[in-house]
């Protein structure tokens, strides 16, 4: 159990959105809350979670636990991306491209939170279409998952990294 707590201490956690939803029943309305969170180690591991509960703290806790369970690795290149990438989920489309040192994270809203916890320090990013936070987060993670490192490309093609980089 101590190992899990130590690991959780290393993770950065960000709350992106809390939403109140209602269900109308015969006796009135029943309110419920949803929370969207992202967690990352700041070094290429990132995950997101979506939790629902009757109370806000419970929804946030559920979302954090789901985010920790759904973590994936992202191949970064000195705090930026390997190459320009696109990601999409339903009506949201995102475009991200690597940026030079000192640029910072030029991205809005939900995208910025994902990139910060993933450990990306310099990136130019733009969200197109729907800016629904859930879909933007999913599209951003889709784009990061589609990114390939030179080592991955070299292994796939059966060539050396030097041949790939030219």
Curated annotation (Swiss-Prot):
Keyword Zinc-finger: no
SUPFAM superfamilies: dsRNA-binding domain-like, Ribosomal protein S5 domain 2-like
Residue ranges of every copy of the S5 DRBM domain listed in the record: 11-74
Gene3D superfamilies xrefs: 3.30.160.20, 3.30.230.10
Listed InterPro entries: Ribosomal_Su5_D2-typ_SF, Ribosomal_uS5, Ribosomal_uS5_bac-type, Ribosomal_uS5_C, Ribosomal_uS5_N, Ribosomal_uS5_N_CS, Ribsml_uS5_D2-typ_fold_subgr
Keyword flag Protease: no
Entry GO CC: small ribosomal subunit
Keyword vocabulary terms for this entry: Ribonucleoprotein, Ribosomal protein, RNA-binding, rRNA-binding
PROSITE patterns assigned to the protein according to its UniProt record, in alphabetical order: RIBOSOMAL_S5, S5_DSRBD
GO molecular function: rRNA binding; structural constituent of ribosome
GO biological processes: translation
Function noted in UniProt: With S4 and S12 plays an important role in translational accuracy.
Family according to the record: Belongs to the universal ribosomal protein uS5 family.
Annotated domain remarks: The N-terminal domain interacts with the head of the 30S subunit; the C-terminal domain interacts with the body and contacts protein S4. The interaction surface between S4 and S5 is involved in control of translational fidelity.
PANTHER family found in the cross-reference section: MITOCHONDRIAL RIBOSOMAL PROTEIN S5
Subunit structure: Part of the 30S ribosomal subunit. Contacts proteins S4 and S8.
Protein's UniProt name: Small ribosomal subunit protein uS5
Organism: Pectobacterium atrosepticum (strain SCRI 1043 / ATCC BAA-672)
Gene transcribed to yield this protein: rpsE
